[in-house]
A protein has these predicted regions:
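Short alpha-helix carrying the canonical HExxH Zn2+-binding catalytic motif
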Residues: 97-113
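Metalloprotease/metallohydrolase-associated module, dominated by Zn2+-dependent proteases
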Residues: 5-50, 56-58, 63, 67-86, ...
Length: 154
């Protein structure tokens, strides 16, 4: 086990602060979903899709705290290849991918998961799943991938 994962309970307040700050930034600076994307978000299980904002960015936001940054890197959460990341109702998507339907639906599934579990519940479950199963096999990631494919291919 890596040290940052073992320190997650102590780091959680800082992680929550970071997630809340990034969500606020996305809500302040992002754009609302189009009517078609609102329909997709509803199909993905989002109860309040009108609250979602999407921010196109050159790169996905990184945590400022070194141990949180290390944990995110070790779990594969934020890599140079990361296309998008959801912070509550805020979705950050790399510039050029913000109109990619499958990516947005995938992230909307994560919004629905945040709605269901709350920020702390989402983060704890998500990180534990990735630690135990790896990023690609984490149940929350599989759910998002499968739902995105199903919705896009309807």
């Amino acid at each position: 086990m890596n040290l940052p994962f073992l320190e997650l309970p102590q780091l959680l307040p800082r992680v929550l602060d970071w997630v809340e700050a990034e969500q606020k930034r996305a809500l302040d600076q992002g754009t609302a979903l189009s009517p078609a994307a609102l329909d997709d978000a509803r199909a993905a299980g989002v109860r309040m899709p009108e609250s979602i904002r999407v921010c196109a960015v050159p790169e996905i936001p990184q945590p400022g705290h070194p141990k949180i940054k290390q944990l995110a890197a070790e779990l594969g959460l934020i890599t140079p290849q990361t296309i998008a990341m959801t912070f509550g109702f805020g979705i950050f998507v790399r510039t050029g991918r913000a109109s990619d339907r499958e990516t947005l639906v995938h992230e909307c599934v994560h919004v629905a998961q945040y709605e269901e579990l709350g920020v702390e519940g989402f983060l704890m479950q998500y990180v534990v799943q990735i630690f135990k199963n790896g990023y690609d096999n984490a149940p929350m990631e599989r759910e998002a991938r499968e739902a995105a494919l199903r919705i896009v291919n309807q």
